[in-house]
Amino acid sequence: MIETKPIPGLALPRHDHALVLFSGGQDSTTCLAWALERFAHVETIGFTYGQRHSVEMECRGRVRQVLAHMSGRSGADWGSRLGDDHVLDLGNALHHVGQSALTGRSPIEIGQGGLPTSFVPGRNLIFLTYAAALGWRRGLRRMVGGMCETDYSGYPDCRDDTIKAMQLALNTGMEAHFVLETPLMWLTKAETWALADSLGGPALVALIEEETHTCYLGDRSQRHPWGYGCGECPACSLRAEGWREWQTASSA
């Protein structure tokens, strides 16, 4: 009989433990709050890849610090559920592969085939693969991401079909039982603001407005009612329009 030994550092799989792809932006912060409401233990993962808006990595720490002292509207103590943060450095690989406006200095506009020049080919596929590899070792079987098909700027790796295909591929390739959660998949940006309010109330909304970062240009010099940003790029436009729609609906 062959004796089996545990793999050093390998945690037992837990489906009430989650790993959130956390960039420091509005969507991933909302997803982190969503996960903290639902799961007993939540860790976060972020990536540096030469992104133009690298200021988002600075926002991550501040957002986590505030969330660690917050509770949800349900009464859940988010601080007791918030676990380790992991940052993986992907170097300049995505810049060399993608040649995107998100990793370079070219204008952000609609390019060939109708895709924005900010599209980084394979980015979410790479992120999910690294996240699953980390989750496999740490026993985290719920992967939570802010991908959205409603306000997704035309990115094909944000589509629901893509995420379902990735879940199948990751589970097959790692012999695991990952569940890829995308709570924003069918929400408009206005509904994402409303979700944040339902999860953490005015305190979470204020945190998102003040500390999260969405602007593709990395602009933190201009403060708008909905947060910081250039106010012109597609990411700022989506965030601003969603905020206005949510405010209008809330006051009706």
Curated annotation (Swiss-Prot):
Keywords: ATP-binding, Ligase, Metal-binding, Nucleotide-binding, Queuosine biosynthesis, Zinc. Disulfide bonds: none annotated. It comes from the Bacteria. InterPro entries: QueC (IPR018317), Rossmann-like_a/b/a_fold (IPR014729). Zn(2+) binds at C215, C230, C233, C236. Its cofactor is Zn(2+). One of its GO terms (biological process) is queuosine biosynthetic process. This is 7-cyano-7-deazaguanine synthase. It comes from Granulibacter bethesdensis (strain ATCC BAA-1260 / CGDNIH1). The gene is queC.
